[in-house]
From Swiss-Prot:
Gene transcribed to yield this protein: ndhI
Domain named 4Fe-4S ferredoxin-type: residues: 55-84, 95-124
Organism: Crocosphaera subtropica (strain ATCC 51142 / BH68) (Cyanothece sp. (strain ATCC 51142))
Taxon lineage: Bacteria, Bacillati, Cyanobacteriota, Cyanophyceae, Oscillatoriophycideae
Enzyme class: translocase
Name under which the protein is recorded: NAD(P)H-quinone oxidoreductase subunit I
Chief location: membrane
Key words of the record: 4Fe-4S, Iron, Iron-sulfur, Membrane, Metal-binding, NAD, NADP, Plastoquinone, Quinone, Repeat, Thylakoid, Translocase
Reactions accelerated catalytically: a plastoquinone + NADH + (n+1) H(+)(in) = a plastoquinol + NAD(+) + n H(+)(out); a plastoquinone + NADPH + (n+1) H(+)(in) = a plastoquinol + NADP(+) + n H(+)(out)
Amino acid sequence: MFSILKQVGDYAKGTVEAAKYIGQGLSVTFDHMRRRPVTVQYPYEKLIPSERYRGRIHFEFDKCIACEVCVRVCPINLPVVDWEFNKDAKKKELKHYSIDFGVCIFCGNCVEYCPTNCLSMTEEYELAAYDRHELNYDNVALGRLPYKVTQDPMVTPLRELGYLPKGVMSPHDLPEGSQRSGKRPEEIIEEAEASS
């Protein structure tokens, strides 16, 4: 008889312990249900990185003195700095600057040791591309344009195709009443309306 009572007592203890463990597990589950979700719907929601996040490097062309400190402190000698010596000013002039973010380890040494603070880390972390060559950012992709738009070798032929006579780069240099080499869209519409 005592053996049956002992078995019933052990069964009751086991039941109480099982209920306790189930209750602990459910309390953890309900606690997590009340919390804010950890994941975000990425393309539509974006996490805000911390203040000292090391993202894509921003480069300011006008501040760079072509000292190449960034190349010397980089563990993989990554930044490509092309410069030429200006004999009149007796100093280096930067011609081209590029960084390949497919190889960069984002250590931040170049930013830390730059004497003119022309390099800085941004909070941009979306650097995905279909082709690895697209991750090679030149001075235009890293920051703002290196020269005036009127001196850009890509813009010069386009401007000559447009509305100014050949060789004239600024509309302010034209005398009043001079003919343009092309027609503006408004002029084309006016001619079409006049002929119909």
